[in-house]
């Protein structure tokens, strides 16, 4: 439930596109070429006057480092707009897809709108005519739900603090197995019933097995980045549908407000569990759990991208089983073989390390609660489309503001408070003000 940039340190040597590179990262070749040496000042000045504009158009990255000579005026603002907007879009697309899947399911499959049970974390029912009793039950359900989330988060942080990577990895694998197999089987069965599509059980089991097996490989081992992102979106949508179905209506709204406050405290407080988790991962130079984080970054590891040794000059090392026990990569997962690039011409003996991941990372909890808010807006009451679209736009506006603050402060920030606050305000204002106004206009056949 946090958003953060993939950076190991708050002290950067570069800005704009490479602002996420830490001070310990090796300087790229383009940056080194742009810095004049003491012995070639005249040649640098000549190169600056003759080729600055041409090289800027062909390769803007060579001016990405601060202090590079010959940077044209306005290039910094152009790169900020280009790559800042790119990061926003790279998060808008998955969040939008997740919410679209949830809303489409709510509008078409009646199973997820039928109230025939509750979660064990919300034992108090709201089937009472008394408004006060219903409000009290929703508050009690919220306290129990938030307490469970706090305890499990602290438990996860303690396990990670003491390097219990295998236990955490097994925990995440069991959760992924349940989501990718059991919940997918239930979802697919209800969709087939809704659209009256006949399918025999062997074919259904085979489809679920193939879907789940590929998802487990992509999430917990290796696979294309796009496929991994797609499975994380599907997992978030399935979990959101479960919350929408089994959370009581009033309890769901109170839980959304409380979880945004908890997210604010857990990320920004010095001893907050999520902040301690991120800081510990940065100190150890390790990635956050791959099954809990959606990454919008371009990934250069062999596990997520295909490298052609003939064209890239890279050597892919074979997998060594002994590395599984010694490496802490991916929190106890088998290490991904790394690719080492050959020294570039003109730089003999210089060995470039693997380029650092850049981009914005968003927790899957944010996807889930964004979708819960929009799904509840689509499922409760009259299911008015104006209310649903208002919540959808509010979440995207809040996410955009969160990313703006992330670019300003350059540290892990909670992604729920702004979006959830806007979503709740837009929901209740649209449902109680805009919808009655539109209904009145329609009943009197007035058009604006």
Swiss-Prot record:
Location (main, coarse): endoplasmic reticulum
Keyword DNA repair found: no
The protein's Enzyme Commission number: 3.4.23.-
InterPro entries the record matches: Pept_A22A_PS2, Peptidase_A22A, Preselin/SPP, Presenilin_C
Keyword terms: Endoplasmic reticulum, Golgi apparatus, Hydrolase, Membrane, Notch signaling pathway, Phosphoprotein, Protease, Transmembrane, Transmembrane helix
Chain positions covered by the region annotation Disordered: 1-74
Stretches assigned to the Cytoplasmic side: 1-87, 160-166, 222-223, 271-358, 410-413, 435-448
Pfam families in alphabetical order: Presenilin
Gene Ontology, cellular component aspect: ciliary basal body; cytosol; endoplasmic reticulum; endoplasmic reticulum membrane; gamma-secretase complex; glutamatergic synapse; Golgi apparatus; Golgi membrane
Catalytic residues in the record: 263, 366
Keyword Hydrolase listed: yes
Polar residues bias (residue ranges): 19-31
Bilayer disposition of the protein: Multi-pass membrane protein
Compartments (UniProt record): Endoplasmic reticulum membrane; Golgi apparatus membrane
Disulfide topology: none
Membrane-spanning parts: 88-108, 139-159, 167-187, 201-221, 224-244, 250-270, 359-379, 389-409
Intramembrane parts of the chain: 414-434
Chain location of the short sequence motif PAL per the record: 414-416
Superkingdom classification of source: Eukaryota
GO biological-process terms attached to the record: amyloid precursor protein catabolic process; amyloid-beta metabolic process; apoptotic signaling pathway; brain morphogenesis; calcium ion transport; cardiac muscle contraction; cell fate specification; dorsal/ventral neural tube patterning
Residue numbers carrying Phosphoserine: 22, 25, 30, 52
Tissue: Ubiquitously expressed. Highly expressed in the liver.
Domain statement: The PAL motif is required for normal active site conformation.
Subunit comment: Homodimer. Component of the gamma-secretase complex, a complex composed of a presenilin homodimer (PSEN1 or PSEN2), nicastrin (NCSTN), APH1 (APH1A or APH1B) and PEN2. Such minimal complex is sufficient for secretase activity, although other components may exist. Interacts with DOCK3. Interacts with HERPUD1, FLNA, FLNB and PARL.
Family per similarity comment: Belongs to the peptidase A22A family.
The protein's name: Presenilin-2
Organism the protein comes from: Mus musculus (Mouse)
Source species taxonomy: Eukaryota, Metazoa, Chordata, Craniata, Vertebrata
Gene of this entry: Psen2
């Amino acid at each position: 439930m946090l958003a953060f940039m993939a950076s190991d340190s708050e002290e950067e040597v570069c800005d704009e596109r490479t602002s996420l590179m830490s001070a310990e990262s090796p300087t790229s070749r383009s940056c080194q070429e742009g810095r004049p040496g003491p012995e070639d000042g005249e040649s640098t000045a000549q190169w600056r006057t003759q080729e600055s504009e041409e090289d800027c158009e062909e390769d803007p990255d060579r001016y990405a480092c601060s202090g590079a000579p010959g940077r044209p005026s306005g290039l910094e603002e152009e790169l900020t707009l280009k790559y800042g907007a790119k990061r926003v879009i790279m998060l808008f697309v998955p969040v939008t897809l997740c919410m679209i899947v949830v809303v489409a399911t709510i509008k078409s499959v009646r199973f997820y709108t039928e109230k025939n049970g509750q979660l064990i974390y919300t034992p108090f029912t709201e089937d009472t005519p008394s408004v006060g009793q219903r409000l009290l039950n929703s508050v009690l359900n919220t306290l129990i739900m938030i307490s469970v989330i706090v305890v499990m988060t602290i438990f996860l942080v303690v396990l990670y603090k003491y390097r219990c990577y295998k236990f955490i990895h097994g925990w995440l694998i069991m959760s992924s197995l349940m989501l990718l197999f059991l919940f997918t089987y239930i979802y697919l069965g209800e969709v087939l019933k809704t659209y009256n599509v006949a399918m025999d059980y062997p074919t259904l089991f085979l489809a679920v097995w193939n879907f789940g097996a590929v998802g487990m490989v992509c999430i917990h081992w290796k696979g294309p980045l796009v496929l991994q992102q797609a499975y994380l979106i599907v997992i978030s949508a399935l979990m959101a549908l479960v919350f929408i179905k089994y959370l009581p209506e009033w309890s769901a709204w109170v839980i959304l407000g409380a979880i945004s406050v908890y997210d604010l405290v857990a990320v920004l407080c010095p001893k907050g569990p999520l902040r301690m988790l991120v800081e510990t991962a940065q100190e150890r130079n390790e990635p956050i759990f791959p099954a809990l984080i959606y990454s919008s970054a371009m990934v250069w590891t062999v596990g997520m991208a295909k490298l052609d040794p003939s064209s890239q000059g890279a050597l892919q090392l074979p997998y060594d089983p002994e590395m599984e026990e010694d490496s802490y990569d991916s929190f106890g997962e088998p290490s991904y073989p790394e690719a080492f690039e050959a020294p570039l011409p003109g730089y003999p003996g210089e060995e470039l390390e693997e380029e650092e991941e850049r981009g914005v990372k968003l927790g899957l909890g944010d996807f889930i609660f964004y979708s819960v808010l929009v799904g509840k807006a689509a499922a409760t009451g009259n299911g008015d489309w104006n209310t649903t679209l208002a919540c959808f736009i509010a979440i995207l506006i809040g996410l955009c503001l969160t990313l703006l603050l992330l670019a300003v402060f350059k540290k892990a920030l909670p992604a729920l408070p702004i979006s959830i606050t806007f979503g709740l305000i837009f929901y209740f204002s649209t449902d109680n003000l805009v919808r009655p106004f539109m209904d009145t206009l329609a009943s009197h056949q007035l058009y604006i």
